[in-house]
Curated annotation (Swiss-Prot):
Record's keyword annotation contains Ribonucleoprotein: no
Membrane topology (UniProt): Multi-pass membrane protein
Lineage: Eukaryota, Metazoa, Ecdysozoa, Arthropoda, Hexapoda
Encoding gene (name): Ctl1
Domain of life: Eukaryota
Species of the source: Drosophila melanogaster (Fruit fly)
Keywords from the UniProt entry: Glycoprotein, Membrane, Transmembrane, Transmembrane helix
Record's subcellular location: Membrane
Region listing for Disordered, in residue ranges: 1-20
UniProt protein name: Choline transporter-like 1
PANTHER family: CHOLINE TRANSPORTER-LIKE (SLC FAMILY 44), CHOLINE TRANSPORTER-LIKE PROTEIN
Carbohydrate attachment residues: 261, 385
Transmembrane segments: 28-48, 205-225, 232-252, 282-302, 332-352, 408-428, 527-547, 562-582, 591-611
Length: 691
């Protein structure tokens, strides 16, 4: 059938087009909604039982978190529920009995060593820092002398001597290097590493958010550069990635040099294991950055001759973006949704890591088994027969027991992270693919971006939920195998070389499958947008189109996608460099590389969302060109532009073959991916119908 407009040709095309658009993969949308309802239930419990400030600031023996205005009131503990906003530091009554000692929140740590009650009173008068129990009348110290009933590890005042201290992680740690001080650091080092990790993220969330915002600006700048400098953008990105990788590598080695050789290291922090962990982490990252930098430089050197061929590809994609300025809306919306989700996810993970329920503990040595801890009764924690609060000598204190079942929900949220991030990416890819396909096969004056987003929300959320779940299925086993391989190589028992080789092969196989499925999804979304069919049939149609042009597909995806990957590396490297500069000297962090790693990962996600705009435009245009060439031959729209180079042919010269009446940016006469379907219940006409 020819391409000229005729009633017969138009009628045949209309008969081949799907007349009705209906919802696709609705079952998968229901599954995704149920999964998210489960995540919300977990989040509610984590917000109720989790409190990161309990780990960061510490809490006293009465259940009050230091440095907090509102604390929960426990019946039977008159000193609970206090406003400790002006008391950010945690003070132990006896450093020799840390596990038994009463602990309170104070305004500041003792600035001098004290050995008498009168010195405590004088220090209170000068600084306003009360080192005795909250309800103790400090004026009684004038007559208390050095009575052991007053000054002991149970209070109401601390045992002597009260050592000069400095705050370390909001805990008053005596100055010096003696055995007592070492015991204090042993207690700090016994904290859960995961709790320290999330505590550092919580403390630096504003810096993480700021650097992620900068990553967004850098990504937008790269997209703008691709639009206006399409002919040389490949070279610019290669130069930028070399500069950024070299700068990040130098910064990491410089940070490692400072940690290892810096004179006058603060001995208060050098006794913490986190100091060593930072040094090891920086060294590891520096080595990895060096290896990555060398690999990137070598690969860029060998691909330099193929970069020139990408100019036509990026130029045509830039032309598409000029005609469709609304394409930038989809990545920006995806960015906002991703930031909102990641913020929610981090908040829930922090609360899950610190989730605990209040319990009462006797004044007796306790250990990590928590066998002595009892959950707090619903109506009362401790009931005293004493009518005088000042005479209250507690035989129990508030301790928070880990909520083990709730913490185990962490792994559900790991799956939720992968699936939801992939779902956000898939929604963006679908909107972009649909908009570009509508632009290619319809009039150039239309701006179909909002139209494509509307169709996605109204009809095709189930399809993107299914597509993102398929990727999740292959990604999770790969991550598990990668973790097992790392543990195997790190452990003393390295295992057999055969087992290690099998793990490597499995990891590589899952990685290849994931990449293949991701690429197939890109093209399947284009077919779904046009044909309004389910995911699996659409993937089959897209695969057939790609299989007939396998050489061109390999070239575009090997070189073009590598350049876009380099753009993402530029954003992640620059963001990591900024994060190191801002965080390396920030006090109070257990493990400052933790937020730096989070910054790099989040920045790469952000760059992936923004820069995948070009990737989707290129892949969609190529799929449209393949189908246009198959159906219309040299009379199709593809032959009139640089798109012809994508399939190994030269574009038609002016006057070489006069185009027919509606060739330029008008609907082609044959329906791409045409599938005859019966009318559905929804009478809305599919987007490919003629105007």
């Amino acid at each position: 059938m020819g391409c000229a407009e005729s009633k017969d040709g138009e009628g045949e095309a209309q008969n081949n087009r799907p007349k009705y658009r209906s919802c696709t993969d609705t079952c998968w949308l229901a599954i995704y909604i149920i999964f998210w309802l489960f995540l919300i239930v977990i989040a509610i419990f984590s917000f109720v039982y989790g409190n990161p400030l309990r780990i960061i600031n510490g809490y006293d023996s009465f259940g009050n978190t230091c440095g907090v205005k509102y604390n929960e009131k426990f019946q039977g503990f008159p000193l609970s529920g206090m406003n400790t906003l002006d008391k950010p530091e945690l003070f132990y009554f006896d450093v020799k009995e840390l596990k038994k000692s009463l602990k309170i929140c104070v305004k500041s740590c003792p600035a001098k060593t004290m050995t008498k009650g009168s010195e405590l009173l004088e220090y209170y008068s000068q600084t306003g820092t009360q080192l005795c129990k909250y309800d103790y009348n400090m004026q009684q110290l004038t007559t208390a002398g050095n009575d052991a009933k007053t000054f002991n590890f149970l209070g109401p005042c601390p045992s002597f001597p009260v050592h000069e201290s400095s705050p370390v992680l909001h805990r008053c740690v005596p100055k010096g290097t003696g055995e007592k001080v070492q015991n204090y650091y042993d207690m700090l080092n016994n904290w859960d590493v995961a709790q320290q990790f999330v505590g550092d993220i919580y403390s630096t969330w504003h810096i993480i958010a700021m650097v992620c915002g900068l990553a967004l600006l850098i990504s937008i700048a790269l997209v703008t550069m691709m639009h206006w400098l399409s002919r040389i953008v490949s070279w610019i990105i290669c130069v930028l990635v070399i500069v950024a990788s070299v700068a990040l590598t130098v910064a990491l080695w410089y940070a490692y040099y400072n940690i290892r050789n810096k004179s006058g290291v603060n001995t208060q922090y050098s006794m913490l294991e986190e100091f060593v962990r930072n040094q090891q982490a920086v060294l590891t990252l520096a080595v990895l950055a060096t290896i990555t930098m060398i690999i990137l430089i070598v690969v860029i050197y060998f691909l330099k001759n193929k970069l020139a061929g990408l100019s036509a590809l990026f130029e045509e994609a830039g032309q598409c973006m000029m005609n469709l300025p609304g394409l930038l809306i989809a990545p920006l919306l995806a960015f906002l949704v991703l930031i909102a989700f990641l913020s929610f996810w981090v908040a829930v993970i922090i609360c899950l890591a610190t989730a605990s329920s209040p319990g009462q503990s006797p004044i007796a040595p306790f250990d990590n088994s928590k066998a002595h801890q009892q959950p707090l009764p619903a109506n009362a924690l401790f009931v005293s027969n004493s009518t005088d609060v000042n005479d209250l000598r507690p035989n129990a204190r508030v301790e928070y027991a880990d909520a083990g079942v709730l913490r185990s929900m962490f792994w559900i949220y790991v799956v939720g992270l992968i699936w939801t991030v992939e779902f956000i990416f898939a929604c963006q890819q679908f909107a972009l693919a649909a908009a570009v396909a509508f632009w290619y096969f319809q009039k150039p004056t239309s701006t179909p971006t909002f139209y494509a987003i509307g169709k996605l929300v109204k009809y095709h959320l189930g399809t993107v939920a299914k597509g993102s779940f398929v990727i999740t299925i292959f990604k999770i086993p790969r991550l598990i195998l990668t973790y097992l391989y790392a543990k195997l190589k790190k452990g003393e028992d390295k295992g057999s070389e055969c087992a290690a080789c099998c793990l490597k092969c499995c990891i590589c196989g899952f990685w290849l499958l994931e990449k293949f499925i991701r690429f197939l999804n890109h093209n399947a979304y284009t077919v779904v947008a046009i044909e309004s069919i389910n995911f699996c049939p659409a993937a089959g149609i897209a695969w057939n189109a790609m299989a007939t042009n396998v050489l061109q597909v390999a070239t575009i995806n090997s070189v073009g996608d590598f350049i876009l990957f380099l753009g993402k590396v530029v954003v992640a490297a620059l963001s990591g460099l900024i994060g190191i500069v801002l965080l390396k000297d920030k006090p109070g962090l257990n493990f400052y590389m933790a937020p730096v790693i989070i910054i790099i990962i989040f920045s790469f996600f952000i760059a992936h969302i923004i820069l995948s705009l070009f990737e989707m435009v290129v892949d969609t245009l190529f799929l449209c060109v393949c189908e246009d060439k198959t159906l219309n031959g040299r009379s199709g729209r593809w032959a009139q532009s640089n798109l012809a180079k994508l399939v190994g042919e030269e574009p038609l010269q002016p006057g070489e073959e006069p185009p027919i009446e509606v060739v330029q940016m008008m609907p082609i006469n044959k329906q791409p991916f045409s599938i005859t379907r019966l009318p559905q219940s929804d009478p809305e006409v599919a987007p490919m119908s003629a105007d």
